[in-house]
Amino acid sequence: MVLTMASQDVQNFFQPLSSWLSRVYEALQQAGDALSASLVLLSKHDSALSDKPEQDLDAAQIQQTYLEDEEQDHDGSPEEASSLFLEEDHFSLSNSDLQDSVQTASPTLGQQAEDSSSVIPPWPSKIPGAPKPQPVLSSIAEEDHHSERQRCGRQHGSGTLEKVNGRKQVNSFGDDEEPSTSSESDEDVTKQFKISVSRSQSFRSGVSEKGKTTELEQKIKCKRLLCTHQEDSAEGSACEDLDRTSQLSYSEILSYEDRPISILPQSPFESRNVRHHGPCRPEMGMVRSLGRPCADGVLETETAFVSRGFEDSYATHSSSLWSPEEQDGTSLQVPHRLLEPISKCGDLDVIFEYRAVTQKLTVTIVRAQGLPDKDRSGVNSWQVHIVLLPSKKQRGKTNIQRGPNPVFKEKVTFTKLEPRDVASCAVRFRLYAARKMTRERMMGEKLFCLSHLHPEGEMKVTLVLEPRSNLSSGESPLSPSVVSHSDSASSTQSLSHGGVPELLVGLSYNATTGRLSVEMIKGSHFRNLAANRAPDTYGKLFLLNCVGQEMSRCKTSIRRGQPNPVYKETFVFQVALFQLSDVTLMISIYSRRTMKRKEMIGWVALGQNSSGEEEQEHWEEMKESKGQQTCRWHTLLES
């Protein structure tokens, strides 16, 4: 009995305690379940946003999904709570106690569910409205766009690199062009291309009109000349034989024209280049020299003396051209318009007298006139140097004379000159400006071929002094001696009196490989108008298509302080054979100045839109030379 009562007392004592502990456990379990459910929902939502940012979720479906999860969480919490009470082995709870515990725990559960719902529902309610996800999605799209732009930029960069590599391939022998090009250069090229197009159209139309009359006059004059030489011959083929044997003499008579031609019939193209501009008289050929020698002491001539250094033999003697009536005349009157070169330094009056018996040639230098005044040249003292070519062993010079029209009247005699050697010799005249403390400076020169010389008696000639020569090498490449010379006082030979800037260019094209080789050999009369010193110059080459778009570009290295710079740089362009007649080569010479913008000295265009007839003839000669280099001087046009 006592035990029964004691057990009841113990049971009554522990029953409230166990019920309180069970309620506390239930509350903690429910709170933990609600918290875990909310964390699971948050993790699901975050994973859904991170894995599928571009997926368009419907607001109602999202809200329904969250509500179903909430209901499952709320339904699962009481089941778990009831299972806790069923697992109590040591304590038996009455229905009332269980109900009380459930009623006690239900406010806590409701509070926890309310707390969880207060945290979770804002997410689905805010996601459909897209205030926050939109910035996230837009930033991702922007990143994709940015990455795509970066990819495009990398592709564009590779294209630019290929173009740079293309330039390096083009400029295989010279310095490469700078990576960044100024808009001024592009504007200059566009302007020059338009000018060259207009100039090309103008001179081509003029040539087409004069072509027929020139060809007719040439045939008539040639026939008249040949008939004069063959008066005693009755054979029908005499004229043809004379045409072949006296080709040198006939071309020499025509050598006064402005275009350089080749006397020796090396190719059919050169013979086709012989043209007339006036009456076919030997006197004119005498005054106009066969070649225009350069200022460096090496003979550069495209006629009787080729660039190979007098290696070719002369099959004919031009003295047979002179008729008795012409030999009687001692003074030659030459039209002034035929004596005007591209640029002029003055006139030199000389008298030639050759005696075959004594084998002596006496050259009397009478006077010079039309020289630049002191304001333009800086000097007022003059001296003439003469030399007998090709040996250069016999030389002479006059005394120094002053004034704008110095009178010399001095004689120079060349001895041991046999009659058979007269036709293969020439006399070179050079006019120097004499200075006291500095080295003399050459102002102009002229070459007179002795094949025009009278066999007996005196012959008065007025020579037009020119500042620069013009050379055409025909089918033979340029002799190294032409550019390996040592210019006398090259740093002081800038013709401040107004010599025209010129550029010696070599062209060759290989039809098999499609390689167009352009060699910038040397320049002449590059002046620095802004300073009293020789300029620092470099050249730029542009290859343009038929509409003026740039295909390739390159440039030379800088030549510092040289009025007559020697470049000797070759650039190779890849041009297909069918494109050769549609491209234009633009060459521009610039003067580089410190702390100032560059200044263009001049430019020239060759090809489809050549800047002149000389340039067009050079281009055509290159196409017919079959891979051999052809070299010519070109006068630069002002910018």
Curated annotation (Swiss-Prot):
Keyword Electron transport belongs to the record: no
Keyword match Transmembrane helix: no
A Pfam family of this chain: C2
Annotated spans, Disordered: 95-191, 470-496
Domain C2: 344-463, 499-634
Ranges of Low complexity composition bias in the record: 476-496
Xref: SUPFAM superfamilies: C2 domain (Calcium/lipid-binding domain, CaLB)
Assembly, per entry: Homodimer. Can also form heterodimers.
Name of the protein described by the UniProt record: Synaptotagmin-16
Recorded name of the encoding gene: Syt16
